[in-house]
């Protein structure tokens, strides 16, 4: 009976230790996931800003070229 109690106690402690290690890994994985999401949102905002910036520059370039052509032809 005494050896059975020792064995059960040993299994209980080993199970508790392995469970705590699994929880630590899980929390570490969740932290990595948050970093990945933040990185994903930042890259999305960065891409959108580039797209908007390029379109604004194209529009400004077209308007500038039209204005220069107008001045060159004295049609303004």
Swiss-Prot record:
Q: Residues of the signal sequence?
A: 1-22
Report the SS bond pairs.
Answer: 70-76
Keywords, in A-Z order:
Amphibian defense peptide, Antibiotic, Antimicrobial, Cleavage on pair of basic residues, Cytolysis, Disulfide bond, Fungicide, Hemolysis, Secreted, Signal
Tell me the Pfam families matching this sequence: Antimicrobial_2, FSAP_sig_propep
Q: Could you tell me in which tissues this protein is expressed?
A: Expressed by the skin glands.
Q: Which residues form the propeptide?
A: 23-37
Superkingdom of the source species:
Eukaryota
Tell me the protein's name. Esculentin-2MT2
């Amino acid at each position: 009976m005494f050896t059975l109690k020792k064995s059960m106690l040993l299994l209980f402690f080993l199970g508790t230790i392995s469970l705590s290690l699994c929880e630590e890994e899980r929390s570490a994985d969740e932290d990595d996931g948050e970093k990945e999401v933040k990185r994903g949102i930042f890259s999305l905002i960065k891409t959108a800003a580039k797209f908007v910036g390029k379109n604004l520059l194209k529009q400004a370039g077209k308007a500038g070229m039209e204005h220069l052509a107008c001045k060159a032809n004295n049609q303004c």
